[in-house]
């Protein structure tokens, strides 16, 4: 839904797409396209590169090598790498890439949501992990919009958290 959201902006945003799927074999080939993608970034100079890891619908997790190369390239053009981690808590491998734990920095932002792992589908409750100057800019913009989900969804989520803590069903996500 990101292209639709961008279209509602100031009209100057353009969306560039770069596929990491071999469409003939329907195979995930992000690592094989790392160099090509980095060259694409340098050529087109996007302000934001948005990745999803793991992605939907394949559940593929981008490799550390791929993401590190993209971040290094984005830094060269003074852009931002944003990773949407909507499905991060649904990765059950014992070893995950280091970038799953990166703190935000001047060029890296992570988007988070509890709507997938917290049985809150459709509630759009989430947060951003970003440098302070990004958070401050977002607060300026958000100060004139609705800042939270509607009351019904807040109450439902509150009940879910309370019940899940009491019955221990939330523990698996916190370990």
Label each residue range with its predicted role.
Residues 3-5, 60-63, 91-96, 122, ...:
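A short acidic (Asp/Glu
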Residues 11, 76-80, 106:
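A short helix->loop->beta-strand "cap" motif at the edges of active sites that frequently abuts
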């Amino acid at each position: 839904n990101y292209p639709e959201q961008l279209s509602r902006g100031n009209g100057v945003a353009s969306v560039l797409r770069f596929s990491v799927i071999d469409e003939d074999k329907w195979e995930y080939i992000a690592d094989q396209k790392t160099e090509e993608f980095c060259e694409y970034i340098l050529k087109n100079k996007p302000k934001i590169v948005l990745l999803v890891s793991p992605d939907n619908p394949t559940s593929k997790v981008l490799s550390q090598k791929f993401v590190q190369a993209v971040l290094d390239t984005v830094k060269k053009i003074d852009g931002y790498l944003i990773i949407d981690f909507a499905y991060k808590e649904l990765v059950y491998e014992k070893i995950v890439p280091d970038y799953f734990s990166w703190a935000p920095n001047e060029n890296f932002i992570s988007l988070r949501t509890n709507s997938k792992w917290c049985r809150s589908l459709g509630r759009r409750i989430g947060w951003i992990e970003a440098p302070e100057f990004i958070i401050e800019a977002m607060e300026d913009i958000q100060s004139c919009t609705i800042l939270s989900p509607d009351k019904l969804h807040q109450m439902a989520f509150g009940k879910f958290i309370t019940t899940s803590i009491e019955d221990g069903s939330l523990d698996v996500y916190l370990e």
